[in-house]
């Protein structure tokens, strides 16, 4: 585990140091390049922060019993807010998001932890989508549960890799995951949180489409 931690933390940190050194070593750099290097360094630093947060989470899950703090939550509003927060990232990748959300959907859940699940699924969709494609986000009411789907268009995940996708540190495409700063922990954390809510999460991939489905009980905590 320590080897994984060292490698995944070092990748974005090396980029941050490299671009900051360029800014220090080249005082005559053009304003355009300065802005570009600063932007890249900031992006890598933010990825490093995400990795550190993920490592804290996974350590806590391994060493202690995670306690949920359930409250009545408007799931529709949560997903709308998350989709809105992703607007800058989507624009950067030439992506769009199409939301079809059942209005006024409320469930009993730990709002912060569940928000982390859908943030992770949306971030995963962004990182593994073809440029200029569309991400689909849907929320459907079932009889005693709700179903949330996050679907994107990207390289089909082979069945032998799909079966391991929720395992800690597993990465479908190591080269692409390294480029996006992914740790291979996000989906493992998502599964842990969903199952603690009494729900289920699964993934499907075919015909260059990747689909994640989460089913949660309306009551049940």
Feature names for model-found ranges:
Residues 125-126:
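Short helix-loop "hinge" at the ATP-lid/N-box region of the Bergerat-fold HATPase_c
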Residues 157-171:
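Short conserved segment of the HATPase_c
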């Amino acid at each position: 585990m320590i080897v994984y931690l060292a490698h995944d933390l070092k990748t974005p940190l090396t980029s941050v140091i490299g671009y900051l050194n360029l800014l220090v070593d080249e005082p005559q750099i053009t304003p355009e390049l300065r802005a570009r290097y600063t932007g890249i360094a900031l992006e890598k630093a933010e990825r490093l922060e995400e990795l550190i947060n993920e490592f804290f989470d996974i350590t806590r899950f391994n060493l202690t019993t995670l306690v949920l703090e359930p409250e009545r939550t408007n799931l529709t509003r949560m997903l709308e807010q998350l989709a809105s927060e992703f607007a800058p990232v989507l624009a950067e990748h030439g992506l769009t998001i199409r939301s079809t959300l059942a209005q006024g959907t409320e469930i009993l859940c730990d709002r912060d932890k569940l928000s982390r699940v859908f943030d992770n699924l949306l971030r995963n969709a962004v990182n593994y989508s073809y440029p200029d494609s569309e991400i689909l986000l849907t929320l459907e009411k079932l009889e005693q549960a709700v179903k949330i789907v996050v679907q994107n268009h990207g390289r089909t995940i082979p069945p032998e890799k799909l079966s391991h996708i929720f395992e800690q540190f597993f990465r479908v495409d190591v080269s692409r995951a390294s480029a996006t700063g992914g740790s291979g922990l996000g989906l493992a954390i998502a599964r842990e949180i969903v199952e603690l809510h009494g729900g289920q999460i699964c993934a499907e991939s075919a015909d260059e489409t990747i689909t994640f489905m989460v089913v949660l009980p309306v009551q049940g905590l």
